[in-house]
Amino acid sequence: MGQGKSREEKGTNSTNRAEILPDTTYLGPLSCKSCWQKFDSLVRCHDHYLCRHCLNLLLSVSDRCPLCKYPLPTRLKISTAPSSPPPYEE
């Protein structure tokens, strides 16, 4: 007992995580490409954005996006959205 080797811990690779945008009002007219209504909590798919609701619905059906045919994002990272405009400089 106790002879087995412990597994190596795999670090989470942040390069394969999709970016989630909590609020996209500062980016201009971005919306979910599936429902075309939501503009908050958008997740970047290959070349478009999906809201989290549509992403969950699409993941329950398949692991590929029906719009771009690429794999749907399953790992997310929170982006740092600006909370205020940059400071005024003279």
UniProtKB/Swiss-Prot annotation:
Posttranslational modification: Myristoylation is required for the role of RING finger protein Z in assembly and budding.
Q: What is known of its domains?
A: The RING finger domain is essential for the inhibitory activity of protein Z in transcription and RNA replication.
Subunit relationships: Interacts with protein NP; this interaction probably directs the encapsidated genome to budding sites. Interacts (via RING-type zinc finger) with polymerase L; this interaction inhibits viral transcription and replication, Z partially blocks the product exit tunnel for the releasing nascent RNA product. Interacts with the glycoprotein complex; this interaction plays a role in virion budding.
- Anything further noted? Inhibition of host myristoylation by the compound DDD85646 leads to proteasomal degradation of protein Z (and not lysosomal), strong inhibition of Z-mediated assembly and budding, and reduced levels of viral replication and transcription.
Q: Tell me the membrane topology, using the record's own terms.
A: Lipid-anchor
* Lipid sites, type N-myristoyl glycine: 2
What domain of life does the UniProt record list for this protein's source?
A: Viruses
Annotated GO CC locations: host cell perinuclear region of cytoplasm; host cell plasma membrane; membrane; virion component
**HAMAP family registered for this protein in UniProt:** ARENA_Z
InterPro entries (UniProt xref)? RING_finger_Z_arenaviridae, Z_RING-type_Znf_sf, Z_RING_Znf
Motif PPXY motif: residue span? 85-88
UniProt keyword list: Host cell membrane, Host cytoplasm, Host membrane, Host-virus interaction, Lipoprotein, Membrane, Metal-binding, Myristate, Viral budding, Viral budding via the host ESCRT complexes, Viral release from host cell, Virion, Zinc, Zinc-finger
The listed locations are: Virion; Host cytoplasm, Host perinuclear region; Host cell membrane
Q: What GO biological process terms are annotated to this protein in UniProt?
A: viral budding from plasma membrane; viral budding via host ESCRT complex
Q: What is this protein called?
A: RING finger protein Z
Identify its protein family: Belongs to the arenaviridae Z protein family.
Zn finger limits (RING-type): 32-68
Role this protein plays: Plays a crucial role in virion assembly and budding. Expressed late in the virus life cycle, it acts as an inhibitor of viral transcription and RNA synthesis by interacting with the viral polymerase L. Presumably recruits the NP encapsidated genome to cellular membranes at budding sites via direct interaction with NP. Plays critical roles in the final steps of viral release by interacting with host TSG101, a member of the vacuolar protein-sorting pathway and using other cellular host proteins involved in vesicle formation pathway.
**Is the Membrane keyword given for this protein?**
yes
Which organism encodes this protein? Answer: Lymphocytic choriomeningitis virus (strain Armstrong) (LCMV)
Chief localization class? virion
